A protein has these predicted regions:
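Hydrophobic helix-and-loop "lid/oligomerization" segment in the mid-to-C-terminal part
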Residues: 1-154, 167, 171-179
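The C-terminal output helix
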Residues: 162-164
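Long, low-complexity segments enriched in small/aliphatic residues
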Residues: 182-184
């Protein structure tokens, strides 16, 4: 297997650009940007639907969010990305999954490392309600009996009663222009 020369000129695969030429690098870049845009549209649509679930069920009153993605028409491959978006928006550890035929909620967790709860995975394991939680401290796969979800909410609300997930958290979003050496 060899390397592909990014400067090599090839026929464009861009819609409406029949007969035009572009470099491999241009084509790969365009395809990646388009894939990311599709992924973001799906993620944003899913987050909007989950916002309704959270609002209708007053789930944001809990210390953690446990959400059901069964009604979402998005790929299972985006579960972690969507959970990360919800965790960032609500500033709470989030579990997002789908109900399996055997009655388990299975999916992805995303924690908030900048909060007092540094290891969401260990917290969940310590509850004794989880079938499994495997992965990183704040990004992992999980499984819990659907019947244990309310028990986990009770456990989390009690154990995390004094944790303020907004405390000490400041979101900054800005663009720096110019020479980085000018920043002091």
């Amino acid at each position: 297997m060899g390397f592909i020369d990014g400067d090599k000129v090839i026929p464009s695969t861009k819609r409406g650009a029949k007969g035009e030429m572009e470099t491999v690098a241009e084509q790969v870049t365009r395809n990646c940007v388009n894939a990311r845009s599709r992924q973001n549209r799906e993620k944003d649509k899913a987050i909007e639907l989950l916002d309704i679930q959270i609002s209708n069920n007053c789930l944001d009153e809990n210390k953690i969010l446990i959400l059901n993605a069964d009604e979402l028409s998005v790929s299972n491959n985006l579960t972690g990305l969507i959970a990360m978006g919800i965790a960032a928006k609500y500033k709470k550890p989030t579990m997002l999954g789908r109900i399996s035929p055997d009655g388990y909620l299975k999916g992805s967790i995303r924690g908030r490392e900048e909060s007092e709860l540094k290891d969401f995975k260990s917290f969940l394991k310590g509850s004794d309600y989880m079938d499994f939680v495997e992965g990183h401290a704040n990004a992992a796969g999980f499984s819990i009996k659907e019947s244990d979800v309310s028990k986990l909410y009770d456990y989390a609300n009690k154990e995390l009663a004094n944790v303020d997930f907004n405390e000490g958290f400041y979101e900054a979003d800005f663009v720096i222009q110019g020479n980085y050496s000018e920043i002091t």
